[in-house]
Design a protein with these regions (language model features):
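A short beta-strand submotif of the Rossmann-like class I SAM-dependent methyltransferase core
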Residues: 148-153, 164
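Rossmann-like AdoMet
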Residues: 1-83, 87-130, 143-144
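Short, glycine-/aromatic-enriched active-site segment of Class I SAM-dependent methyltransferases
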Residues: 187-204
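Short "lid" loop at the C-terminus of a central beta-strand within the Rossmann-like core
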Residues: 133, 157, 184-189
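Conserved beta-strand signature within the Rossmann-like core of class I S-adenosyl-L-methionine
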Residues: 148-149, 171-187
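Short alpha-helix
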Residues: 203-230
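Short amphipathic alpha-helix with an adjacent loop that forms part of the alpha/beta core around
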Residues: 135-145
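A short, conserved alpha-helix within the catalytic core of class I
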Residues: 127, 136-138, 158-176
């Protein structure tokens, strides 16, 4: 089937392609067979990503690290609630589900519409078709006393700093307690969108980055940094 997406939403096909390519490799890092299944059903020119090896290893290492961190949280809180911000066609729930967690996928209506074409309904998974910058989505999250983890992968770098600040305020204004895991882009990379091995072929571009991971908590004094992982280590 043909898929048409605008600007930032189209970048979800980059990570989908990298995970699917990994699944076909002899020594897969994620072995994400669902991504391989999805990509086989999409009519899109994925060939423009074929030589993007820097993005390939970057996407996989980032996904693996985040999988591991999410698993640690689940081990500590087996019946927790997890919200995936800007989920795209992410398949993390299928990779880390323990049979008890409650999962929410948050993305724009056009993206959630596409998700429903590829994923079977699950009573513990809820799709929310709203913008992360619209605080109304927080009312859809049912915690019922459970611990909350908010994750976002490959999303924040496409927005302006003021938007990131707005998003963080939505989190701290609407949730009394939560843990968050975000991936951040190095500031020096922001101006290199047109040279980036995948973005050079797309409309989307990087808009925000940091010199140090601690910079994100400076945007909201209610946040406290509890850890930092360098994906290049």
């Amino acid at each position: 089937m043909k898929i048409k997406l605008n600007n930032i939403s189209e970048t979800m096909l980059i990570t989908l392609y990298m995970r699917a390519t990994d699944a076909k490799s002899e020594k897969p890092i994620l072995n994400d067979k669902k991504s391989e299944e999805i990509i086989s059903q999409i009519d899109y020119d994925f060939s423009k990503f074929k030589s993007a090896w820097a993005s390939y290893y970057g996407v996989l290492s980032r996904a693996k690290v985040m999988d591991n961190e999410v698993k640690k949280f689940i081990t500590k809180y087996p019946d927790c609630v997890i919200v995936s911000i800007g989920c795209g066609l992410d398949t993390r729930f299928l990779r880390i589900d323990n049979g008890k967690i409650r999962w929410y996928n948050l993305d724009l209506p056009e993206v959630i519409e596409k998700r429903k074409l590829f994923f079977e309904p699950n009573e513990r998974v809820t799709d929310i078709a709203k913008s992360a910058f619209d605080s109304a989505w927080t009312k859809d999250i049912k915690l019922e006393g459970k611990k909350l983890l908010i994750i976002s992968e490959g999303v924040l770098m496409y927005f302006e700093e003021q938007q990131i600040k707005q998003f963080l305020e939505i989190l701290t204004d609407n949730f009394d307690s939560f843990e968050a895991q975000f991936d951040l882009l190095y500031k020096g990379t922001v101006k290199m969108s047109k040279k980036h091995d995948t973005l050079k072929n797309m409309e989307a571009k990087f808009n925000w980055g940091v010199k140090d991971g601690s910079e994100i908590v400076k945007l909201n004094p209610k946040l406290k940094q509890t850890g930092l992982i360098n994906f290049t280590d």
